[in-house]
């Protein structure tokens, strides 16, 4: 028997147990080996870490991932366990060998149930760089991710959805597109992510308007009531192993296309999507047209294997879209476009995407219909219905969407006929200001890309979360310009 010491430490996802070297060597286990911790009413598998002082002999230290959601007694039994067979399957992939759907399913199952360490699971992701997953392996991975969670079904068909692979500051088309398409009578169970490296995700923006965290049962009720949802996927038991894989990919920014494809399509498949429109902005993430076309083809191929119609739009992702970057500022853009105003570039792209999705739903008059639903206010009414169903205030106004009060303005130092922004600098500035954690932090672009500006005219306003963040922003701006070299006025005659 071992005494239990609950440690206020997180391992980053791995179920770890910390043992004294004396106890570990006595059991013939070493670092990264596995042990089973068991007691009268339960058990778990944990990965061993060794120490000399933190945990004395006769005691096991449990990280928060192990004890936080379990009723573990003060004393437990511990015994050594062999490495799971899935470790060998990962080694096969690293050696360039294809693996069967059954082996992929077992790897995903073991990741889901914490039988693999984070290092071992990360090697599975990295194996896609050694040799790209085949079409069959991509399908097997996607289906295994879906099988590890629950699936939803909606009575009203067809079920439509859209996804953007990201990389463009602002670009908050999703709430507008979903509202337009749902206003046309289609079912759109949209779930979105929070920001990881960007200034805001769709979930962060929607949290400005309403609750975004729901159970699977609640999501079904919302969609059946409002015709659509704009919820956070992380609170749902839909493809939960994908969230584990995303955490593994984040530290080294591992983003192999096969895992990107499986991640996106697994979550769409889990909510019963039949027709999916993918937006691939060519710019930061996808560098050229050849790469964009290849990725589009792979999306369509995998979608077909899953019985899903996938259509892809390759769009220009080199410049930000909309006036705002950051949760509240982007929420303001969304509200203004739905109310018939707002930035023209965001409106135009939203109409383009909505028309494509309506066309996929069988509406040949898709362009005219999308514009009519937006201009008539029907899309706005649908957005309000979604907000209400999600527990928010459907009568929210721009004045209710409060910005941070620490402000820094940046003005043009010369006349320019066509302003172009450095998206990477804008992203860094917005995160330095406090977004997405501080909802009212971000950047407002007074001049949209391509617009003309006079010397001394205000270009950008930064809203920072506090004095310290404001100072960080100001220091950064002394070394980096958010404006790229662009067309300047040489002479006025």
Predicted regions: what they are:
Residues 1-95:
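Long, compositionally biased stretches
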Residues 81-169, 208, 382-390, 493:
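Acidic, glycine/proline-rich low-complexity segments that act as flexible tails and inter-domain linkers
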Residues 96-106, 111-113, 151-153, 255-256, ...:
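Well-ordered secondary-structure scaffolds
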Residues 125-129, 162-163, 202-205, 240-250, ...:
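Active-site-proximal beta-alpha loop/turn segments in soluble metabolic enzymes
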Residues 159-182, 186-198:
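Glycine/serine-rich anion-binding loops at beta->alpha junctions
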Residues 161-162, 188-192, 215, 230-234, ...:
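General beta-strand structural signal in soluble alpha/beta enzymes
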Residues 205-229, 297-303, 307:
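A glycine-rich helix N-cap at a beta->alpha junction
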Residues 226-273:
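Phosphate/diphosphate-binding glycine-rich loops and adjacent basic-rich segments that engage nucleotide
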């Amino acid at each position: 028997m071992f005494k239990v010491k609950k440690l206020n430490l997180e391992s980053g996802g791995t179920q770890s147990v910390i043992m004294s070297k004396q106890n570990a060597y006595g059991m013939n286990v070493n670092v990264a080996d596995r042990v089973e911790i068991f007691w009268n009413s339960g058990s778990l598998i944990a990965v061993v870490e060794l120490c000399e002082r933190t945990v004395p002999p006769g005691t096991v230290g449990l990280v928060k991932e192990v004890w936080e959601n379990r009723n573990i007694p003060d004393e437990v039994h511990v015994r050594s366990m062999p490495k799971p067979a899935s470790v060998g399957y990962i080694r096969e992939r690293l050696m360039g060998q294809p693996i069967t759907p059954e082996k992929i399913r077992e790897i995903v199952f073991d990741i889901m149930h914490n039988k693999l360490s984070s290092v071992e699971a990360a090697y599975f992701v990295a194996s896609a760089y050694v040799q790209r997953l085949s079409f069959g392996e991509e399908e097997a991975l996607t289906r295994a991710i879906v099988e590890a969670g629950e699936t939803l079904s909606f009575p009203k068909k067809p079920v439509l959805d859209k996804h953007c692979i990201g990389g463009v500051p602002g670009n908050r088309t999703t709430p507008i597109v979903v509202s337009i398409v749902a206003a046309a009578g289609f079912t759109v169970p949209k779930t979105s992510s929070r920001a990881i490296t960007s200034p805001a995700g769709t979930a962060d923006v929607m949290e400005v308007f309403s609750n975004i965290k729901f159970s699977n049962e609640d999501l079904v009720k919302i969609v059946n009531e409002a015709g659509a949802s704009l919820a956070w996927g992380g609170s749902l038991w839909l493809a939960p192993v994908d969230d584990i894989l995303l955490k593994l990919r984040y530290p080294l920014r591992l983003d192999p296309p096969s895992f990107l494809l499986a991640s996106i399509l697994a979550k769409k498949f889990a909510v019963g999507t039949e027709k999916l429109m993918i937006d691939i902005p060519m710019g930061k993430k996808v560098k050229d047209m050849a790469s964009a076309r290849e990725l589009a083809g792979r999306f369509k191929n995998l979608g077909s294997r899953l019985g899903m119609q996938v259509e892809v739009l390759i769009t220009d992702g080199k410049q930000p879209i909309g006036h705002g970057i950051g949760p509240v500022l982007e929420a303001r853009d969304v509200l203004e476009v739905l109310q018939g105003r707002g930035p023209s570039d965001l409106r135009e792209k939203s109409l383009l995407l909505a028309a494509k999705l309506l066309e996929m739903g069988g509406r040949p008059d898709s362009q005219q219909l999308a514009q009519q639903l937006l201009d008539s206010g029907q899309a706005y009414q649908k957005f309000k219905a979604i907000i209400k169903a999600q527990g928010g205030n459907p009568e929210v106004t721009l004045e209710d969407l409060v910005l941070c009060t620490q402000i820094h303005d940046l003005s043009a130092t010369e006349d320019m006929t066509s302003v172009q922004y450095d998206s990477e600098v804008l992203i860094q500035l917005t995160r330095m200001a406090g977004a997405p954690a501080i909802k009212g932090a971000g950047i407002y672009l007074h001049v949209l890309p391509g617009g003309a500006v006079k010397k001394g005219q205000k270009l950008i306003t930064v809203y920072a979360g506090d004095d310290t963040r404001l100072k960080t922003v100001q220091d950064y701006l002394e070394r980096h310009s958010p404006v790229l070299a662009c067309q300047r006025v040489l002479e006025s005659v």
